[in-house]
Structures are given as structure tokens and as C-alpha cells.
Amino acid sequence: MEKSNRSLKDLDLNALFIGDKAENGQLYKDLLNKLVDEHLGWRKNYIPSDPNMIGPEDQNSPAFKKTVGHMKTVLDQLSERIRTESVPWHSAGRYWGHMNSETLMPALLAYNYAMLWNGNNVAYESSPATSQMEEEVGQEFARLMGYDYGWGHIVADGSLANLEGLWYARNIKSLPFAMKEVNPELVAGKSDWELLNMPTKEIMDLLENAGSQIDEVKKRSARSGKNLQRLGKWLVPQTKHYSWMKAADIIGIGLDQVVPVPIDSNYRMDIQALESIIRKYAAEKTPILGVVGVAGSTEEGAVDGIDKIVALRQKLQKEGIYFYLHVDAAYGGYARALFLDEDDQFIPYKNLQKVHAENHVFTEDKEYIKPEVYAAYKAFDQAESITIDPHKMGYVPYSAGGIVIQDIRMRDTISYFATYVFEKGADIPALLGAYILEGSKAGATAASVWAAHHTLPLNVTGYGKLEGASIEGAHRYYDFLKNLKFEVAGKRISVHPLISPDFNMVDYVLKEDGNDDLIEMNRLNHAFYEQASYVKGSLYGKEYIVSHTDFAIPDYGDSPLAFVESLGFSEVEWRHAGKVTIIRASVMTPYMNQRENFDYFAPRIKKAIQADLEKVYASVNQKENV
């Protein structure tokens, strides 16, 4: 695959956002006006001899003017509603909630521009420009993940990308049985157990050698509905995204085949538990369809030991056990740019801090990247497929998810052709529709991601700096929270962060000193969340905005127990409460890496927390006095 040698040594992230206070607003308007003018000129210059369809007489008619007035009224109403009811997550240091932040100006401009053409990337003939851009984005995804022969594309979101990953795994795992039906010689001498444990590359090699029988083999695969219950278990960590359950339902393997793997005290997959589960099923002759490792879990930002999962697979393969590996890096995928040099080579760990310093990835000389996180990202290239969401850490507008596969030949296991949109065998520069789950899809999304990638190279000189700004901001926030204490209504409330971030997610709880009732602590945190969110009053006037979640026993097992016990609660109390309520922050703001910026907001955040806690306790006291 052709390498990207693009580099921006003097990149200034401040030039790429509209800005907290619209500091670059005029630049945005100038660029947008230029692009709109170019589109209008494009319309006028297409067959200029054609007559105008709308004349001065039309434009001066009462009905025309009335219609324009009505349209303006509707747009005024739209503007008022959006300005009144939207979340101010553009804020540099006020929004500490979901995976939202400033979006890149080039991505916004590209989307605004390309949507004027309304291209549909399902078919090249309806979107030649943006279909080729999406093909290029897919190649860039593959380079980012270290795939020499990979392929990728944009999807609506990470949920669909995960579903597509399971679709690949299901169909590939079923192919050996299909080959046995169509051409037994391809898999001669292999038992059913061996067929269920064939490595993906070996299956792809056999499919490639099936020649004219490929279509017949595909017909006899899992897409026919055969052997779905024979393919085995789909193992996911307890920190899984909820989309995996939906995917198992839709793909047809069933929820009973989805097995949660315990996580450790750092909220990463417990590799020993994973091995035990696999060996237990192997002893019962139940295969493992696949394993999901997460890079940037939704609620903790934890990065599973992908390298350890790969090492386990290599060990088990010697014993005749093999599983498909999918990395759900919807959240953390772009962080791999932190580890790639300008030649797309993975930077040795011993050189990483030096390279980061040379490229101004962090403002302070600290070790923000944990060795185990580095090792996990290095092993990405061993996974068969990876989910990556540009609309998260790619800082592009919704809706833009993505999936990338290790071997471009895998596309043939899920392909469908329709002559009116993508004819089989046609010589088309970007044939997307035949190899994806979705039908119609916005060309503007591809333009948006393409513009972001071409403004910020997917290496340490570009996106690495943006991811680094987020990570450094998260560490500043974590360190700030560690020492916070508040006096409210004669009580002392302390802040207890969950864990040091693997990525940029910071979770914490508020605990009243001396409280030994976990249910009461959960109530406090939920009440605080309500004060600091949309639940209580307009968001536009709130000085500190957060999100929350629950770590509950049905989903997490006892993995939160160590944290709960560190707060002074007993195991009995943990089982009685059944959950711990957490305040959760995805620190995506690109501004909090700067010490001066953070130091401005820190005391104001503390003041806002104090005010919200006072409201919480005032409400409690009022109820008690009624």
C-alpha cells in the first residue's frame, strides 16, 4: 500500500477550530462564502446556453415573496430552537461530559460544501468525487492501523461498524463448511473441529483458489442460514458497547452466543479469564467465533491488552484453537496516530517521548502514554478488523463511523452486487456499495473526513498532536480532581477519581466523608449530575456540565469492587446497592492541554461544583423539613 509521507512540523491546532468564542469566526465565514460562491459558479457554468428556470418575474411575484418570507420565518424558528436547546460543547473548559467537542473547521467546511451536491456514495455514478474520497479515506484508515493489504470505508457510526465486523467474522468462519459442500478437496482431511478453527488468512487463501466456484461457496456459507449455531461464542469484555448485543441479534448468531469476559481493576479485559473461558469451551468442543478487544471503552476510556490477546491467540493456535479478532476502537482508534512517524512506521517506545517532544505533542515533559497502552496499539495490525469513528476522536461532524479490515480479500465474503448501482466486474475507481452494509450514504461525510485527514496527517505531526492535546487535558483534569474537597451544610465532600486515564476519559465520584451507605452516595452523585446537566434548567447558563453512568453488577460483575472498597464501603454494602453511580467526562477539548487555559477554568469549575452541591443539599434539607 502506498505510504503517506505528509507532514506538518509547524501545525497550529488553534487555526483549525472556529474557537470557544468564535475567535476564528470570520475566517470560517470567509472560507464558507468562497466555497458557496464556487458552487454557485459551478451551477451557472454547466451548459451556459441553457435558459434560466427562475426569472425576475417569478422572483417579484407576491407568491414568491410570501414563500421566501415563510421560509425565513421557519429558519428563524429553527435557529431559536437550536440556540436555546443545544449543548455548548464547543466550550474550552465548561463541558466535561460525552464524546463531543469542537469539530475541525476544514471538516465542517467540507461537509457544508459537499452537501450542496448531495452525493450518494452507494453508487459511483451518483458521486464520483466523494466516492473516490471515501476510497482514499479507507486506504488512510488501513495505513493508520498498519495494514499493508487492508481496506476500509465510512459507516454511519460505530454500532454499524461493529455489526459489520461481526458479519465478516460470521461469514468467514462458515466458509470452510461451505467449501466442504462445494469442493471437498479444498479442505480434504480436516475434521469439523479443524474447519471451525482455521485461521482467517488460510480461509482467504482457499477462497481465492476456489476460482469459478467462489459464488457457490458463498451461497453455502452463513448467508444461507446454515451452521449459525455451530460457529461458536463471541467473547466481549464486560466494558462492551451495547451495540454488540444488537449485532448478535441482527446477524443471527443470537444473544446466547455472546459471552462477557471479566475485566481487571483497571477496567481492561482480564486475559487470564479470557484464556480460561476459551479453554472451557474448547474442552466442550465449542469453538470461539471471535474475541472483541476494546481501545477506549465507552465509560472508562480503558484500552484492553490487544497485544496480550494476540499472544494468547498465537499460543492457542499451536493447540489447534483459533478465533477472529476485532478491535472496537470506535473511541480510541485515532490515537494510533500518536505512535506513527512521517513514514507511517510505528515509533519504538524508547524514542516515543523524544519524538513527541520534537513534534510538540505535549506541552510538558511527562510520560502520558503508559507502556501497556503503547503495546496494545502496536498490536492493532494483528486484528482482522477494527472499528474507528471519525465523529469521535477524528473531530468531524456526525455521522461518521468507520471500519477497516486487515485483508482486502475479506470484502468478497460479504459482497452483493446490483447492476443498477454497482455492476459486478465494472471498471469503477471506487466500488463501495457492493462491499458495505449500508445503502444510500452521504458523500458529504466522506468529503468531511477526507478534508480532516488531509489537513491533519494521520501521524505524530498531525492527528497525533490533536490526540495528545486531549490526553494531556485529561491528565490535568484528573490531577485537579484528586485533591478537591468541599464544605457543604456542615459536611465535607471529597472527590475520588476512578483510575488514571489510559486515554482521555476521567471518571469520579463525590463522597460525603464518613458515609458508609453506598446507596446514599449513589443518590448524591445522581443528584449532582442532575444539577450539572440538562435535567435541571437550561444548559446555556450552566458553568459546569457533566454526564454520568452506573457500574452495575449485571454488567460489570465485581470489577468495581476494589474501587468501592477503596472508598470505605464493604463488600456486603456493594452487593446490597448493586451498583456505583459515576460522574463521567470524555475530555475531548483541544484547549485544556495548555496550563494557562486550564488554570483559568479550574477555580471556576470548583466554584460551580460547590454551587451545585449546595443546591443538592438544600433540596435534601427542604424535603426532610416537609
Swiss-Prot record:
It comes from the Bacteria. GO terms for molecular function: L-dopa decarboxylase activity; pyridoxal phosphate binding; tyrosine decarboxylase activity. The keyword Lyase applies. Optimum temperature is 50 degrees Celsius. Only 8.5% of activity remains at 70 degrees Celsius. However, the enzyme shows poor stability at 50 degrees Celsius, the relative activity dropped to 14% after 1 h of incubation. GO terms for biological process: carboxylic acid metabolic process. InterPro entries: GrpII_AminoAcid_Decarb, PyrdxlP-dep_de-COase, PyrdxlP-dep_Trfase, PyrdxlP-dep_Trfase_major, TyrDC_C, Tyrosine_deCO2ase_bac. Pfam families: Pyridoxal_deC, tyr_de_CO2_C. The modification N6-(pyridoxal phosphate)lysine is found at K392. Pyridoxal 5'-phosphate binds at G158, S159, T298, D389, P390, H391, S440. Its cofactor is pyridoxal 5'-phosphate. Changing H241A: Complete loss of catalytic activity. Its EC number is 4.1.1.25. Belongs to the group II decarboxylase family. Tyrosine decarboxylase subfamily. Catalyzes the decarboxylation of L-tyrosine to produce tyramine. Cannot use other aromatic L-amino acids as substrates like L-phenylalanine, L-tryptophan and L-glutamate. This is L-tyrosine decarboxylase.
